[in-house]
Amino acid sequence: MKITRKAATQRRHRRIRRKVFGTPERPRLAVFRSHRHIYAQVIDDVAQHTLVSASTLDRELREAFKDIGTATREAAAVVGRSVAQRALQAGICQVVFDRGGKLYHGRVQALAEAAREAGLQF
């Protein structure tokens, strides 16, 4: 039986999560991508607590998406910069990147590169 795209993504995500674990010193930057939006959270897996987050649904970022839309690489870069700035304000400078089972390509890659440029280390 052929594996569906969703099943392949879930399989990759389980494989990644076995290896990627966020600690208080180096939390996990988790990315979730849907067809219309992208979400990023910095998570402490020990305390099971989200430290900072950003998404294309944030009220503060909505003005940036008026012209570019929410399902673009540019929107993902805005979210990446935003989550990096919020993490740095919270005193977090190093994270572990969790691409959420998605391929490191397109919007996921744009978010990661923007977060790196904004000062997060991973």
From Swiss-Prot:
Q: Which domain of life is it from?
A: Bacteria
Gene Ontology cellular-component terms for this entry are: cytosolic large ribosomal subunit
The secretion signal range is none
Keywords in alphabetical order:
Ribonucleoprotein, Ribosomal protein, RNA-binding, rRNA-binding
Give the GO molecular function terms. 5S rRNA binding; structural constituent of ribosome
Gene Ontology biological-process annotations: translation
Q: Which family does the entry's similarity section mention?
A: Belongs to the universal ribosomal protein uL18 family.
Subunit composition?
Part of the 50S ribosomal subunit; part of the 5S rRNA/L5/L18/L25 subcomplex. Contacts the 5S and 23S rRNAs.
Q: What does this protein do?
A: This is one of the proteins that bind and probably mediate the attachment of the 5S RNA into the large ribosomal subunit, where it forms part of the central protuberance.
Task: Tell me the NCBIfam families matching this sequence.
Answer: L18_bact
Question: What is the recorded name of this protein?
Answer: Large ribosomal subunit protein uL18
This protein's encoding gene? rplR
